[in-house]
């Protein structure tokens, strides 16, 4: 130790960094740690703490160091929140410490610390973990004790000189357990004042021998008698960390006195320490090791050894091994600073509670007053020390009164609230409901009374442990896991990645990842997988918001998820946290091989909320998720807080409101062209009614609502008889009363309702005195405005009048066709009308419930009773006013409501909604030479059967989709650029949707989406299987051919051909051919929108030209999309014999398809144009030019792969092509569309457009030729 540096405590504290040091950099001294015989838990291993690479190891000093000092008992001079931990002092400064290999002789002796960890702390400067140490001077070992085998609990300076005759009892045995230090009120012997004395209890399994002596040790001891010893007083309580080290070992105490105490009415004999008490260190018998019981298996208690993976909520929740959690919730527990992430701890007398939650099974280690924890190895990581909180909150008191499963659940809820940046913005709520209070309020509303556990004092629970109910924990718990959205989304991604990894191990890549083109041909949501909330056992927490793309999302601080058409009450608030207990999770676009596999093989875990698992697989599937929920599925957490619902009712005090009805919504459209921004405003067409609602809600009514939502059935709902104008019935229709009294029912999401009186006042012109007519206006919103999403076509709404209100009819000069800018902060309420005594919707044409409370996600099953619709405000009007309001409420049916299906009773009912499915009479127009579709606007509702990425004569080349909708057993086709409708979350097969204002094409059952068309998703079938493919030829390896039985917008399916083919002579021909060359190839990314990136590759081929030969003639065949995919053979697996290519692709992934690896290149360069200047490909590829739009150059491997792609197409099979001829106008159109020079004039080749492509099966072709000969 000549070159060893001596550090002082002051040096470490002043430096203020976490470091570790040792006396030797090459070898470590022998440790004094005890040779504990208990084995480590099989699940625990040192590598468990190294799995998280984000943890940082303690910084080691690069030179040998030692520290000299003295280990002392706790004292009041060192203010430590943990109160009872060892002290280490070098004479100048004192800090907290813990020591491995503890020996009695170390107390008060000077030691040399050979290896150590130091962690800075705010309260006392720092904490020293002593790993290896040795005595400095063995001659001073007897300075404190009279003998090597005895240590007086109180120094001789304070102890009585005369021995007390009552202090003659002794106890020897095995120390089973130790309680925390607590305070007991006692009477002062000098005065009559009450003083609080600290102390702690120990439980010893003692021997029946009368007197303890060293000479009697060698006789056999039988430790069979249960004895309790109370260490009383400040000096005795300071021995708590020493006695904690002795749990499970032999000890002896002498100089005790006996006291008879009463616990729950029963007497109990307890030994109490005195001023003369002496503690004798552990000993070993000369006849062998004394048998001892380290693991107590009586009841549900035992011992557990494991590594600490994480500490949460200031050490109340400790993560041990997988699905093993230690609860340290009792405020009085004395915990060591050294219980840190990465340390190995040994827990004794802990409750084992195997609990089965709805989301999975968890082993809970419940600590009680008998639990003791010792650290066997210190953590090597730079993690924070465990510091007890001196403040006892109402949440901590509440948690202590619960059973262990309920404690764990409550702590997880508390951690979930950490995912939110801020609590509710209302100042009153912010003051009264912080995160602890919010957790307590939420837990009280969810935890049943059976999970509350009455608590006794520390004496009761320690001495009468078996009778305190600690061993009667329920094994089944119905509390669902509460998760924020970020944790939920992350876990679903991990779950999918693990499932994909398993598939790749079990099957070959070609079986599960190489899909034929028919698998990929659908638009979005081809293969949906649905998980119910009952399957996951998870309740979601989040805030509602409208994203910039127009989607409604549930979000928290770090993540979000799309929400599928929820019908929410208008009192939603973006700043309030919502609870979603009932929902459907829709996972879309996954491979068919994954659909029938168990998605919940790895259930949700507590660690999913606390410490999400990092994604194990990169470059994997990108699948969109969405939630489907309804009114009853989204509630505010503060719904029981009085301020929450009173604030809603206060809005209706002494104010008047405008009434309007939504007639149409214009969709949020993405531009669809790179470099051009999306729309900055969205619009809603509305009809402003010439009535104002005047409310008279009083303070008393707002403070005390009449009833709650569960009491709102028609039988028990309270009624107030409305004032009915007796002369109203006799008046003519043109004689409109100035005011109509009505009854108003106000509802909010907090389940509270309020019934009050109100008045409808009509708006009359000043000069004539006649009533105003309804005004049709255009409401302008920003896309992020939540009001846009909440407004439903056909719904009536209330808006409160304001000082700068431009919505007033007759007051601010509003007129027809005015555009009104809607402010985002404007509050709206949905409104429904009912007449006479009917308050709920009974199916009448005159009652208009405008916001449905039923779930948006409808599962097809029989005998499902749908809940009645519900709105924010209901107006009960006199029956005489029914005819008056029908003018305003029913005059829009001809414009926006679809025509009924006559008397045909074969209406399908694939969802639980009570709305009747309608169909529109398509316009029957004569053929026209116009390039644009001609027809009437229609509105209808039906079931989406399929969405095909095909081309049409009425839409552009690259973004056309055909929506097949089943309406009254008739197939209706709708064409249009569906991807531009950014709000269509969850749209696809199995969706029931209503299509508003779509344009007829003049052909039967054929329609087109326009920029004014709006699609509303009503419900979604819960299907876990892919859609049934239409019957196709078994030999086809490409898209199924479009047969006459299917929808064909016109005879020609090619985009360019049909745009200019205005005659019937341009028929398509079929021929078998071989690819000679790839003349032109345009590759680009399909979309920048992540929702478009389904399980297919994100490559778009807007144009491709192939030189083909049918044996007699050579053609220049142009095509796009999936037909080009098929000819290029992108869906086939890469051949293994292509050595260079395979080596290149393995650097990216081991996925087998050509399309996947091409996607890697296109994703980088955005757009690639390949052009061949010759009619055939030369061997050296000298006539091929490749242009990219990105700033990066093609790498050598990328250039080689693209040229190999052309060779792969040339070496392909014989194709059967159905094509139509092209003229120069069509070619020029394609050149302008794709901004390329096709230069077809220099080749004397006929240009054709390939409409259908499929591989020729020789047997099928021979059979068809034979059939043709036979038929001829």
Curated annotation (Swiss-Prot):
Compartments, as annotated in UniProt: Nucleus; Chromosome, Telomere
A GO cellular component entry from the record: chromosome, telomeric region
Source organism, top-level taxon: Eukaryota
Disrupted-gene phenotype: Severe telomere deprotection accompanied by a rapid onset of developmental defects and sterility. The large majority of plants have grossly distorted floral phyllotaxy with an irregular branching pattern and fasciated (thick and broad) main and lateral stems and siliques. Although most mutants produce an influorescence bolt, this structure is highly variable in size, ranging from very short to wild-type. Flowers and siliques are often fused, and seed yield is typically reduced to 10% of wild-type. The germination efficiency of the few seeds that could be recovered was extremely low.
Keywords, ordered alphabetically: Chromosome, DNA-binding, Nucleus, Telomere
Pfam hit, one: CTC1_2
GO biological processes: telomere maintenance
GO molecular function terms attached to this record: DNA binding
Function of the protein: Component of the CST complex, a complex that binds to single-stranded DNA and is required to protect telomeres from DNA degradation. The CST complex binds single-stranded DNA with high affinity in a sequence-independent manner, while isolated subunits bind DNA with low affinity by themselves. Associates with enzymatically active telomerase.
PANTHER family named among the record's database cross-references: CST COMPLEX SUBUNIT CTC1
Subunit: Component of the CST complex, composed of CTC1, TEN1 and STN1. Interacts with POT1A.
Family of the protein in this entry: Belongs to the CTC1 family.
Protein name: CST complex subunit CTC1
Gene name linked to the record: CTC1
